[in-house]
Amino acid sequence: VTIPPAPWEGEWNHTDDSRVSERNKANFKIELENVVRSLKNHPSIIQWIVFNENWGQFSTMENTQKVLDMDPNRLVTAASGFTDFEIGHIQDYHSYPYPTIGTWYPGVPTVDYPTTRRIRVVGEYGGIEYNVPGHTWYPNPSGVYDRPATSVEQLTMRFTNIAEWANAMAKQDGLSAAIYTEIADVENETNGLVTYDRKYDKINIGRIRPIIEY
């Protein structure tokens, strides 16, 4: 039985060199080197991420090795989310709403490289929207990762559920870190734990504290 590709599979399958012009490749390499060289002594930087979610991803091994050579004192992630290569210090998955280790978008290729030499993390999970009128940048934000919550109580319950899932993965699957999307609302997304203006807590902080301090 032949299963046809999903309609969007062609978009995601261009993961290494495809759809990146030679001009853009050359510009990326120049900017990559300039950014690392100019900022590598900044104390607040703890990690370099070369590519995010296949966006313009090309020559992953070469570009990541360049960063490793330029700054041997920091952690380096080759690709945050999606197409992974066995290089760098961290294997990073993106998964919504629950944290998972593997592919969550049909048609997104991943390579199951061994993780015995690398840290395994979920770099993005959660994304539960809760829109508080009067506290947003746009009147009708459009960024939605999962079905919206409608109250502080509902967001607290759903956050608790998926955060406990992440804690279980730390015990059972060797997960070293999980990053919730996101701490605060941004311009076009209301999936934060506080509003864009930082004036309204959208979640019960006291109830989630024991979970996030796990």
Kindly label every feature range from the protein language model.
Residues 208-214:
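Long, highly charged low-complexity segments enriched in Glu/Asp and Lys/Arg with interspersed Ser/Thr
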Residues 1-203, 207:
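Substrate-binding/catalytic cleft of secreted carbohydrate-active enzymes
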